Amino acid sequence: MLTAAYRAEVASRNMKYQESEETNSAIKKMADALTTKSHKTGIVLCGTCGNGKTTLVRALQNLLIYLKYRNLTENGMPIMDAREVANRMRECKTVPLLAIEDMGKEPTTKLDYGNILNPVIEVLEHRYNEQLFTVISTNLTAKEIKEKYGTRIADRFNEMMSVIIFTGKSFRR
């Protein structure tokens, strides 16, 4: 079903689905992460630009809507750019399912009435503590995540996230 949702997402962008071993592997890994009984409470999709991470996140969102998981949140699973997470921090902490798109693009800190906040870190820590399912896409490597967000977040990622690394070439031409 996830493969069909991925193909439909590609078609919705007026693109032609290009079957590849890398894409099939990523879809299978995500399906396994979603259906295998595990202590993991999230999935992180890592890789360079344009190789299908966002398409897979949107395919999952559309599949959840199709399967009637709409009652969990307004649209199954909100997908928010990491910068939007910084602005909607309170909401992002509590939704049952959340996808954070392009983690790493946002400024690490934000000034709020004189207080320095680290919104993405705060959201991730809260979701970790509450064991709320989170899907993340990023162009950052594990080392870069550790440098930007700190050892604690990197360590929690290792515990809470199933990691899917996208190795394929960019589909954007």
Predicted regions and their residues:
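Hydrophobic anchor at the beta1->P-loop junction of P-loop NTPases
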Residues: 45
